Amino acid sequence: NPITEHWKKEEIGFDAIYTGYLGSFEQIDIIANLFDDFKTPDNIILVDPVMADNGKLYPAFDEAFAKKMATLCAKADIIVPNITEASFMTGMEYKEVYDEAYIKEMLGKLAELGAKISVLTGVSFKEGTTGVMGYDKENDEYFYYSNEKLNASYHGTGDIFASTCVGALMNGLDWKESLKIAADYTAECIRLTMEDP
């Protein structure tokens, strides 16, 4: 890739690399190569494998795409799929009604893909709440944080969450504090949008 070759020649590096929606196998390959070229012991790679929701893949994607996305997640430090995306990448059955054991099993299977920290978004253990649950493979540590579920759905909330999470990490906060800030900020964005659509 001439762009990444130029970056290398100019000795350009990155404190963080964050990916969201990727539209093709080719784009995943380009990003995978970029990760290989620019990963350092000190930087952070976060992948939001945007491709599915509510038990279904988006129309442009199939199960082969989900498996390909799983190979990209393997190269990340942190991954932030929703439950649907995680079910397609791990082969676990998607459930609308679940318990903590199901979520922990799914996080374990996500961790097996290779990322240091796996996070599931849209996790709810109690009616009227929605939250995130993360798993730190190295320290065998889980973290759950929830907010009141707001009765609205907007495109881009996952992007806000992941972007805020990266921003918090870049400001020196640990992964748990970063998830909390990102969840709170996303909830506040939804709340303000509901007040003034």
Q: What is each model feature region?
A:
Residues 23, 51-53, 85, 122-126, ...:
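Glycine-rich beta-alpha junction loops
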Residues 138-140, 152, 193-197:
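SAM-dependent methyltransferases
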Residues 152-175, 179:
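Short, small-residue alpha-helix embedded
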